[in-house]
UniProtKB/Swiss-Prot annotation:
One of its GO terms (cellular component) is plasma membrane. Residues 77-268 form the ABC transmembrane type-1 domain. It is found in: Cell inner membrane. The complex is composed of two ATP-binding proteins (UgpC), two transmembrane proteins (UgpA and UgpE) and a solute-binding protein (UgpB). The gene is ugpE. GO terms for biological process: transmembrane transport. This is sn-glycerol-3-phosphate transport system permease protein UgpE.
């Protein structure tokens, strides 16, 4: 048994190392490419030793963009941050209030409304996205932060998770609040919201990354280059046809795009893990 256990441990560690290398090696190649100049990156085979042009590449794309996209990449990062933060705050606000109303208020057809919200999870994005674009166009929200963020603030998943969490809270909390004369909103802010902070943190991280990584939606909504986002902007830096792509600058843009969600995860890691664990209970 001991020998079998030791062999299983060795196999597990080997598979773990292989998995880590499979994930990190492409990122390392991208980092190396970002440190090279335009001539070095096209040498075959490309070196795996970092060069000395990283800061120059970062400065160029930050101020002037790259390739066919001359919009400063710093502006694209700002647009992505505004979009991701607005989607995150809006999605959490709408979802937690919706779940609170469904669980703690008694009104006709409340369960029907919840299942109508839940059923939207079964519709593919491709089915929902073009009718949503049509609505945004008719409301004259194209090329605006409102059009970028407002349609993505509704979340059946977050509503479902908050509903399930609220249903685990003891009824005695509500009864005690009623005896003390607390209004429904005071009960929400004084009792429910503090108990939900770990769930809020977990959903904040997940939703921020979701908003930051949006690619198709900005492409459909935005035609103004000054409202372009970082993820969509990287694609526009890649030349089409016979044009030459400045891969060193594209990889530098990729590194910058990874930093904000990485910082969010690192800063909120403890709360994020606790929120996921609490949601499983």
């Amino acid at each position: 048994m001991i020998e079998n256990r030791r062999g299983l441990d060795i196999f597990s560690h080997v598979m773990l190392i292989v998995g880590i290398l499979a994930v990190l090696f492409p990122l390392y190649v991208g980092f190396v490419a970002a440190t090279l100049d335009n001539q070095e990156v096209f040498q075959a085979p490309m070196t795996l030793i970092p060069g000395s042009h990283l800061w120059g590449n970062l400065r160029d794309i930050w101020l002037h963009g790259a390739g066919n996209n001359t919009t400063p990449f710093g502006l694209m990062l700002l647009n992505s941050f505004v979009m991701a933060l607005a989607i995150t705050v809006g999605k959490i606000t709408v979802s937690i209030l919706s779940a609170y109303a469904i669980v703690y208020f008694r009104f006709p057809l409340r369960n029907l409304f919840f299942w109508m919200i839940f059923l939207t999870l079964m519709l593919p994005v491709e089915v929902r996205i073009f009718p949503t674009v049509e609505v945004i166009a008719r409301l004259d929200m194209m090329d605006s932060y409102t059009g970028l963020t407002l349609p993505l603030m509704a979340s059946a998943t977050a509503t479902f998770l908050f509903r399930q969490f609220f249903m685990t809270l003891p009824d005695e909390l509500m009864e005690a609040a009623r005896i003390d004369g607390a209004s429904p909103m005071r009960f929400f802010f004084d009792m429910v919201l503090p108990l939900s902070k770990t769930n809020l943190a977990a959903l904040f991280v997940i939703t921020f990354i979701y908003g930051w990584n949006q690619y198709l939606w900005p492409l459909l909504i935005v035609s103004d280059a000054n409202l372009g986002t970082a993820v969509a902007g990287i694609k526009s830096m890649i030349a089409s046809g016979d044009g030459a792509t400045q891969w060193n600058q594209v990889m530098a843009a990729m590194l910058l795009t990874m930093l904000p969600p990485l910082l969010v995860v690192l800063l909120m890691q403890r709360w994020f893990v606790r929120g996921l664990v609490d949601s499983e209970k």
